[in-house]
Amino acid sequence: IIGGVESRPHSRPYMATLEIT
C-alpha cells in the first residue's frame, strides 16, 4: 500500500494510499 502513495503523489500521501487501494 505504501508503494501506492509513491506511484501517485497526491496532496495527501496517506489519503492517496487508501484511494489507490
Curated annotation (Swiss-Prot):
GO molecular function, one term: serine-type peptidase activity
Renumbered residue ranges of the record's region Disordered: 1-21
GO biological process: proteolysis
Keyword Transferase: no
Record-annotated Peptidase S1 domain positions: 1-21
Biological function: Thrombin inactivating protease. Displays chymotrypsin-like substrate specificity.
Name this polypeptide is given: Mast cell protease 3
Lineage of origin: Eukaryota, Metazoa, Chordata, Craniata, Vertebrata
